[in-house]
Amino acid sequence: MLKQQVGVIGMAVMGRNLALNIESKKYTVSIFNRTQSVTEEVINNNKEKKIFPYFSIKDFVNSLRKPRCILLMVKSGQPTDETIQFILPYLNKGDILIDGGNTFYKDSIRRSNDLMKCGINFIGMGVSGGELGALNGPSIMPGGSREAYDLVSSMLKKISAKFKNEPCVSYIGPNGAGHYVKMIHNGIEYGDMQLISESYFILKNVLNMKNEELSNTFSQWNKGELNSYLIEITKNIFLKKEKDGIHYLIDSILDHAEDKGTGKWISQDALELHEPLSLITESVFARYLSSLKDQRLIASKILKGPILKCISSQNKELFVEEVRRALYLGKIISYAQGFSQLKKASEKYSWNLQYGKIAKIFRAGCIIRADFLERITDAFKSNNVTNLLLTPYFSEISNKYEKSLRYITSYAIKYGIPVPTFASAISYYDNYRTMSSSANLIQAQRDYFGAHTYRRTDKKGYFHTNWLTKKEL
């Protein structure tokens, strides 16, 4: 009996579409889902395809060629652990388990170590692009066993997105490296989305832009430095109308930005690494604050603010350009923070991440795909870059656009428009470029009340001072 080449467990939309993607590249696929009716639905809708259903995990595993290649597309956390334990008794040494879920990287580190003891090859694989990306070609970030990756790399390259015919997949590094990169991707996505929404809010309120004009503005931006998937879909969103064909949908959507909880992972990890991920973390907090809709309604009637001053029509074009520049620099700072955290994690876990290759993976198929990733790839031709802001292209843009970021942020603050990520961006920029900061006072305070010591600018070593005068003693 002929056996299938790949197995997929989990037939929710991502697993289903990845199975279809794999089959479309001339692979035979076995599928299994805990709920039998879901498996039957997939088969009934794809009868002509070489996708074979199984309704017991034993039959599913036995249907696969050795070494078996099994892709897990189930909910992250405990459901993934339970699925692994469910399938483990039927596996043989050398088989490959790929976790393609939205998994926390520390779980992937643990699973990689545990499965290695059993002789099972584990790949923790970040997948970005949503349901359409899964079907047509996602950005893929595999980490874990290098031996296992080499066995499945041909398939992953075939199913991945392509940028100028180059597959958007590359081996990331050991154990949890792939899912860590996906976590950074998600954090940058949060930052991008919040920066764009703040830009929209400024244009709408300061310039009184209507939806068609907003769409035209974002369309123009998408032809230049800001060309990206998120800018592209934003221009489309503004034009979407209700079923009545009259009212715009965007105006009826509740301003409560939800999240699946993955955004907090990167911020929590930044705290563990002592990494100043301020912009991305602020974008997470902005979603949390948006969820306080009932409180905000009350606060809007109690708490006072300035009267908004609109820009005159003759200065409109100049103001739009200032917003564009501020958005671009904010985006650069968001990526700079994300890649700086990648570098810190790579050092901690000895992953030896290749940052230029990672930027290449993001160029197509994923949510944060953007033209300027080519610039990041170029910047990381030397893998020893400390911070993107210090590289030639990005430092030049930063020096050119910082006045715009400063102007738009201060204008928004002056007139009561919330811009948490713009404010965070310029604050990070100024802190990062400040040679002598206010932190010397903090160290003095820490030594005063806690004898935590301090270092000096003129001598080496750590020092403690008795800060109390004789009178105070």
Swiss-Prot record:
Keywords assigned by UniProt, alphabetized: Gluconate utilization, NADP, Oxidoreductase, Pentose shunt
Domain of life: Bacteria
Active site: K182, E189
Binding site for substrate: N102, S128, G129, G130, H185, N186, Y190, K260, R287, R446, H452
Pathway: Carbohydrate degradation; pentose phosphate pathway; D-ribulose 5-phosphate from D-glucose 6-phosphate (oxidative stage): step 3/3
Binding site residues for NADP(+): G10, M11, A12, V13, M14, G15, N33, R34, T35, V74, K75, S76, N102
Enzyme class: oxidoreductase
Alphabetical list of SUPFAM superfamilies matching this protein: 6-phosphogluconate dehydrogenase C-terminal domain-like (SSF48179), NAD(P)-binding Rossmann-fold domains (SSF51735)
Known EC number: 1.1.1.44
GO terms (BP aspect): D-gluconate metabolic process; organic acid catabolic process; pentose-phosphate shunt
Cross-referenced Pfam families: 6PGD, NAD_binding_2
An example molecular function term from Gene Ontology annotations: NADP binding
Catalytic activity: 6-phospho-D-gluconate + NADP(+) = D-ribulose 5-phosphate + CO2 + NADPH
InterPro entries, per the entry: 6-PGluconate_DH-like_C_sf, 6PGD_dom2, 6PGDH_C, 6PGDH_Gnd/GntZ, 6PGDH_NADP-bd, 6PGdom_BS, NAD(P)-bd_dom_sf, Pgluconate_DH
Similarity comment: family membership: Belongs to the 6-phosphogluconate dehydrogenase family.
Protein function: Catalyzes the oxidative decarboxylation of 6-phosphogluconate to ribulose 5-phosphate and CO(2), with concomitant reduction of NADP to NADPH.
Subunit text: Homodimer.
Protein name: 6-phosphogluconate dehydrogenase, decarboxylating
